Amino acid sequence: MKSISTIAAYLAVLVLAGVSSLKSAEPGKIEGKAIVRSVKGVATYTTPAGVQKPLTVNTELTSGDSITTGPDAFVYVSVNGLSSAVRISADTTMVIDRMFRTGSAREGVHDTGINLKVGSIAGQVKKVSADSRYEITTPHGVAGIRGTDFSVSVASNGNGTYTVTFTSITGTVVASAVVNGAIQTKTLNGGESWTVGGNVVPVQIQLLQSQVNQINAMITSIANQINPAPVTAPIGPVHIRPQPSGGSASQ
């Protein structure tokens, strides 16, 4: 179960909402891209510069682009080359936080981060390099995914709080969230779901700063229970990005 330890090590860095990676590729990293494979209904994307454009088949997306689907719409997207495919359901807004790889598209290391603001996505992450990472961030927390069919949904309760459901369809998903100020972590195997709901508000930056070490310890403990071997994956610096206030998007 080496893959669980790998997920746990990287979740220690990106375990809560609001934690982001650098947007520009570091030396040796190749900027990835997402390609739209199918569109039904009305769907648009917005560039980091704020330019909104319609989504059509073969549209190429890069890090920082935000996708929005209308009622009764859905979009299929291949993300970061061969690493994954995602189905974006109706009334969904998600941001491609990062898409990098090193090495070849088939054999290299893939680093993908998606920020689901509101709505639902489902997808498949292929088994690639052991050092690859794939995270889905929500306002409550983050899920680390590897070699897995998964779904994540974010619903607004209409009062500034949200309900989030993480599901592992096959494989394993490690998810972490802050509920009533306390960190909770779950390991989901095929067919299992975890719903975080009620009066749970988006994670605040101050909490992110103060809880990173605690989260690291909790996830490392879970990894060691599954695989006693120590986690040796390198942990990089945490980059915390303030969340916009007063937005209407959930999760």
Question: Predicted segments — roles?
Answer:
Residues 1-31, 52-57, 76-89, 101-111, ...:
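C-terminal interaction modules
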Residues 26-44:
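Short N-terminal segments immediately surrounding and downstream of signal-peptide cleavage
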Residues 45-46, 51-53:
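Periplasm-facing N-terminal accessory domains of Gram-negative outer-membrane beta-barrel systems
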Residues 65-71:
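A short, solvent-exposed beta-strand micro-motif common in secreted/extracellular proteins
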Residues 72-76, 94-95, 122, 149-151:
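Histidine-centered metal-chelating micro-motifs
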Residues 95-126:
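A broadly used, surface-exposed interaction patch
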